[in-house]
């Protein structure tokens, strides 16, 4: 059995106790309006969408975590039967993921 990483554990806590949106269109819309606290993107996200998210997130001072796995792996990690290229975090709930990302950026 594979060992669960800190990110995976915190993501599961986030999904259980927080509020998120899935998908690049919804996430970009939420980043533009400043309604998300952070963004998680899969490594396989199309470059044009990645550039848009990074640009809008920089303007809005929203941290972005780049997940090393594919959209399929991120979807599986989230317990979904479909690929997830982006996750917009509206409320982190009991997860420490947002704090860990901010600490890592310093």
Swiss-Prot record:
UniProt source species: Sulfurisphaera tokodaii (strain DSM 16993 / JCM 10545 / NBRC 100140 / 7) (Sulfolobus tokodaii)
Source species, domain of life: Archaea
Record-level GO cellular component terms: cytosolic large ribosomal subunit
Gene Ontology biological-process annotations: translation
Protein name, UniProt field: Large ribosomal subunit protein eL30
Coiled coil regions in record: none
Gene label: rpl30e
GO molecular function: RNA binding; structural constituent of ribosome
Alphabetic keyword roster: Ribonucleoprotein, Ribosomal protein
Family: Belongs to the eukaryotic ribosomal protein eL30 family.
Cross-referenced InterPro entries: Ribosomal_eL30, Ribosomal_eL30-like, Ribosomal_eL30-like_sf, Ribosomal_eL30_CS, Ribosomal_eL8/eL30/eS12/Gad45
């Amino acid at each position: 059995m594979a060992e669960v990483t800190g990110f995976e554990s915190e993501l599961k806590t986030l999904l259980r106790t927080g509020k998120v949106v899935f998908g690049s269109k919804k996430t970009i819309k939420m980043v533009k309006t400043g309604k998300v606290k952070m963004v998680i993107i899969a490594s396989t996200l199309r470059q044009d969408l990645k550039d848009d998210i990074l640009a809008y997130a920089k303007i809005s001072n929203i941290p972005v975590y780049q997940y090393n796995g594919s959209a399929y792996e991120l979807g599986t990690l989230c317990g979904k039967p479909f690929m997830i290229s982006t996750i917009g975090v509206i409320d982190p709930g009991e997860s420490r993921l947002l704090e860990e990302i901010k600490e890592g950026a310093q």
